[in-house]
Amino acid sequence: MSVTLGTPLQSSAFKVLLLGSGELGKEVVISLQRLGVEVHAADRYDHAPAMQVAHFSYVLNMADPAQLKQLIEKVKPNLIVPEIEAIATEVLLEIEANKTATVIPSAKAVNLTMNREGIRRLAAEELGLPTSAYRFADTLESFRAACDDIGYPNFVKPVMSSSGKGQSRVKSFDEVDAAWEYAMQGGRVNQGTVIIESQIDFDFEITLLTVRAKNPETGEIETHYCDPIGHRQDAGDYVESWQPQPMTPAALEEAKRIANKVTTALGGCGIFGVELFIKGDKVWFSEVSPRPHDTGLVTLASQFQSEFELHARAILGLPVNTARHSVAASAVIYAGVDANNLSYSNLNVALAHPDTDLRLFGKPEGFKRRRMGVATARAENTDLARTLAKETADQVSVQTNS
């Protein structure tokens, strides 16, 4: 079956509506643009990164059903591609049921993964996948009881948050009330529910980028895997990542089994970021995102097709190639200040090494711990690549302007 794409801004245009316009969405837009797709980007604030490279952009509250429905009716997209969790998913379920547009990867996947409760119950209770022990709580009293039940130390996360917001490690009962307050401040869409997880004794954690794409000859959906990505987090937020992460053949096989099971249950086509804990040959499921993953920024330097190109190809029904050509690493560049209209200097020094690269996201406003860019590096092994990526990131100087 032939895949046909039209011409942007013409009546034949194939339209994609991106819901959420951050740095990951920006790379997806660029990948779609290269294939002649007309892209419409939406977010809650103007001049978001993906908006800067899209054909059209819109500012709205995507968690408001009326606003979201109005936008979809206006754009009339072929595909709706969510980049964030804070979306009125009931609208997407309705759109999919009416066959008005195709939701990527599926409305079910977006609805289930928009909060940690839905996906954890699917993974642990329906699919029987190994996870940490967990409880949910929606009041301070039930939270205190759940923390005591799980034991200490434990990890607390709002069921709806991203980039580590509202997450904390609770070492004793004395820290419980403060953790509750912090989680309430960090959650999105005022959900008011948290997950309490037991601490797993693991060697390392990985992201297994898993791609569901149609076989061009048979039309059947097949599952492909990128090499495992190792990563380091600080307070739940990605700081650096590298590919490949060495692991035993048995652990890799189990990781693929778990990733296949959860992504098959979610359905649809596209890339999924499956987060897993590894200890020896043992593997535990942690989380899944039905879209490109921040730790996957390393694939810009390591793979023939980055996670963004893989996502674009998969959702358009095109063949994918998950092969890696290099050992690589990525390191985050933070704003370091609370300011807008920032400048980035010393770039010539940062990029002096031929195996390094930068992505500066163009975010209009910076916060001390806001991710404003990423450095990537290739090297003979992951240790050297990590060192080079961090050196490159550290050499970028973020400056304020009056």
UniProtKB/Swiss-Prot annotation:
Keywords: ATP-binding, Ligase, Magnesium, Metal-binding, Nucleotide-binding, Purine biosynthesis
Superkingdom: Bacteria
Pfam families found in the cross-reference section: ATP-grasp, PurT_C, RS_preATP-grasp-like
Reaction catalysis annotation: N(1)-(5-phospho-beta-D-ribosyl)glycinamide + formate + ATP = N(2)-formyl-N(1)-(5-phospho-beta-D-ribosyl)glycinamide + ADP + phosphate + H(+)
Residues bound to Mg(2+): E275, E287
Domain called ATP-grasp: residue spans: 121-316
GO CC terms, sorted: cytosol
Biological process according to GO: 'de novo' IMP biosynthetic process
Pathway(s): Purine metabolism; IMP biosynthesis via de novo pathway; N(2)-formyl-N(1)-(5-phospho-D-ribosyl)glycinamide from N(1)-(5-phospho-D-ribosyl)glycinamide (formate route): step 1/1
Entry keyword annotation includes Cell wall biogenesis/degradation: no
GO MF entry, a single one: phosphoribosylglycinamide formyltransferase activity
Enzyme Commission identifier(s): 6.3.1.21
Binding site for ATP: R116, K157, S162, S163, G164, K165, G166, Q167, E197, S198, Q199, I200, E205
Sequence positions that bind N(1)-(5-phospho-beta-D-ribosyl)glycinamide: E23, L24, E83, D294, K363, R370, R371
Function: Involved in the de novo purine biosynthesis. Catalyzes the transfer of formate to 5-phospho-ribosyl-glycinamide (GAR), producing 5-phospho-ribosyl-N-formylglycinamide (FGAR). Formate is provided by PurU via hydrolysis of 10-formyl-tetrahydrofolate.
HAMAP family membership: PurT (MF_01643)
Family listed: Belongs to the PurK/PurT family.
PANTHER family: FORMATE-DEPENDENT PHOSPHORIBOSYLGLYCINAMIDE FORMYLTRANSFERASE
Summary of subunit composition and partner proteins: Homodimer.
Name of this chain's protein: Formate-dependent phosphoribosylglycinamide formyltransferase
Gene (name only): purT
